[in-house]
Regions:
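N-terminal carbohydrate-binding accessory modules
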Residues: 1-52, 82, 86-90
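Active-site region of glycoside hydrolase catalytic domains
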Residues: 8-10, 81-82, 86-165
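Aromatic-residue detector
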Residues: 13, 21-22, 38, 56, ...
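The substrate-binding groove and active-site-proximal loops of carbohydrate-active enzymes
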Residues: 23-35, 59-76, 113-133, 159-165
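Aromatic-lined substrate-binding rim segments of carbohydrate-active enzymes
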Residues: 38-106, 110-112
């Protein structure tokens, strides 16, 4: 289903196609669940009255080696969003680059620490170059599903728990 909707935030209220809505969301991290279970999970979410699913994206799962990206199998964010859409769920994507989520190194790839000039989670140009490359590849997967393109992705949260370290 393509939603062809207008989504707005006005003050503390959310509006879909001009009508005030409440977002009732649950978190499901696609990379922590088998792809075969996504549809069943979403059906159960709908049965509980939820209308939205929120998911982190773990950079260290998608780019295990510098410049080598994987969006297959349980890492297929596009299929995850497509399955949510099929179940009439809106989607909030939280791509990081840091996600926390009780996930190793907050989802940052291990290799990012190997450069002595690297400073993470700041405006360090080396760090920015790497995470911009990751976000570019990830957004290529997500872009077709943005609400502005008729898809179910209504919001994105970049970074997470900044200044909590």
């Amino acid at each position: 289903m393509r939603w062809l909707m207008k989504f707005e935030i006005n003050g503390k209220d959310f509006f879909k196609d001009g009508k005030s809505i409440k977002i009732i969301s649950g978190a499901v991290h696609y990379f922590r669940n088998m792809r075969e279970t996504w549809d069943d999970i979403f059906k159960k979410m709908k049965a509980m009255g939820l209308n939205c699913v929120e998911t982190y994206c773990a950079w260290n799962m998608h780019e295990k080696q510098p410049g080598v990206f994987d969006f297959s199998g349980n890492l297929d964010i596009a299929e995850f969003i497509r399955t949510a859409e099929k179940n009439d769920l809106m989607v909030i994507v939280r791509p990081g680059p840091y996600i926390c989520a009780e996930w190793e190194f907050g989802g940052l790839p291990w290799w990012i620490q190997k450069n002595e000039d690297m400073e993470i989670r700041c405006s360090n140009p080396i760090y920015i170059k790497h995470f911009e490359n990751y976000l570019s590849k990830l957004f290529d997967q997500v872009r077709p599903f943005l609400f502005t393109n008729g898809g179910p992705v209504i919001m994105m949260q970049c970074e997470n728990e900044y200044c909590y370290y």
